[in-house]
Amino acid sequence: MRKIIIPIITILLIALDQLSKLWIVKHIELNQIKEFIPNIVSLTYLRNYGAAFSILQNQQWLFTLITIFVVCVAIIYLMKHINGSYWLLISLTLIISGGLGNFIDRLRLGYVVDMVHLDFINFAIFNVADSYLTIGIICLMIALWKEESNGNHN
């Protein structure tokens, strides 16, 4: 059952990321900021030619190689551990979805669409795929910690 559910969830997560970016591009002009939840979140449309949180600008070839490598490793690890813990499956699904969501932008547009601006903190503008990656890495750390504390060293 997991072999069916996980690809479906991955496709749905990528679709949500791509639809959110499409909506932003259609409804907000480049570099314009629109208040979404007052004093908490604004939406904007930025073109990010770098990595997550706009680091390493204009290094598309590097991000393409890194993304292909990370996504392939995550897929292989997921397939080998398909019966693993839910934390592990969630983390890898989020990492794969986030990596592919931004990869699609890079291939299609030459940049990644970023849109979420946190008004209450000075933080980089990011997108849904970046959120998947961040949450996925946190879940992976939890999965590895739980595995370590249970003495399960596969």
From Swiss-Prot:
GO molecular function: aspartic-type endopeptidase activity
GO biological process: proteolysis
Database matches in NCBIfam families: lspA
The reaction(s) this protein catalyses: Release of signal peptides from bacterial membrane prolipoproteins. Hydrolyzes -Xaa-Yaa-Zaa-|-(S,diacylglyceryl)Cys-, in which Xaa is hydrophobic (preferably Leu), and Yaa (Ala or Ser) and Zaa (Gly or Ala) have small, neutral side chains
EC number: 3.4.23.36
Primary site of residence: membrane
Top-rank taxon, per record: Bacteria
Entry GO terms, CC: plasma membrane
Location of the active site: D114, D130
The keyword Protease is annotated on this UniProt entry: yes
Subcellular compartments: Cell membrane
Bilayer topology term: Multi-pass membrane protein
Pathway(s) this gene product operates in, as recorded in its UniProt entry: Protein modification; lipoprotein biosynthesis (signal peptide cleavage)
Pfam families for the chain: Peptidase_A8
Record-given protein name: Lipoprotein signal peptidase
Key word Transmembrane present: yes
UniProt similarity note: Belongs to the peptidase A8 family.
Sorted UniProt keywords: Aspartyl protease, Cell membrane, Hydrolase, Membrane, Protease, Transmembrane, Transmembrane helix
This protein's encoding gene: lspA
Regions that span the bilayer: 4-24, 62-82, 84-104, 125-145
Recorded coiled-coil stretches: none
Role description: This protein specifically catalyzes the removal of signal peptides from prolipoproteins.
